[in-house]
Amino acid sequence: MGEYLNRELGFTCLGVRLAGHATRPKDMVRSRWTDWTASVEDGYNLLRGAADHIYFVGLSMGGALSLLMSTRLDVKGIVTISAPYVMPDEHPAWQIQLYSYFKTYLPKTKGEPGTGWFDKDAFKGHISYPLNPIRSAAELKILLDKMHMALPKVTVPALLIHSKDDTYVLPENMERIYVGLVNASDKTKLYVTGSGHVVTRDAARQQVFEAARDFIKRINET
């Protein structure tokens, strides 16, 4: 998406690597929710000197971070994609609490590899950890609680995007976030179909890219 927005609008885009991500699972085990917010703030500070306005665009947990951090940092607008309001069913709170006493990781259990993806070629190029660190799930729960408290404080324009075919973070999560944005100056929601959770890489990605482009362009002109 960053490459698309740069090509279409000439925007400077930064893909923030959150603490514990894209390295090794044991690095994720050591990460806390405050490390993730610090990663966002670091990225914001890198862009601040090079941009007139900054937008947050976040996928999944990145969407929750975008909502929360928009109340702490000066941004022009936010785009959330497949953002959770509650913990995915794969990580019920009781399971996290119980297993945390004697396990470090939980296996990924939702079907065979590629389940939920519509573009199988895109899935082949998708890289993720093979295990779910239990501590990270507990930290995500804390982050979501913080996001809930922050929703009424979000005042910037927000575009919420979710796939109706997302079986990991169910579509009703977007509705609950939308309802919670009681003070956003502009809020829009978009449902797409024919994609799973990672809509920025799955079959509906072009529609998602164009929606984000049009939203940012519109807000920039106001």
What does each of the following model-derived ranges do?
Residues 188, 193-222:
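Catalytic active-site module of serine/aspartate enzymes centered on a nucleophile-bearing elbow/loop
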Residues 79-90:
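Active-site nucleophile loop of the alpha/beta-hydrolase fold
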Residues 58-62, 66:
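Gly/Ala-rich beta-loop-alpha elbow adjacent to hydrolase catalytic centers
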Residues 12-15, 175, 179-198:
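Catalytic histidine neighborhood in serine/cysteine hydrolases
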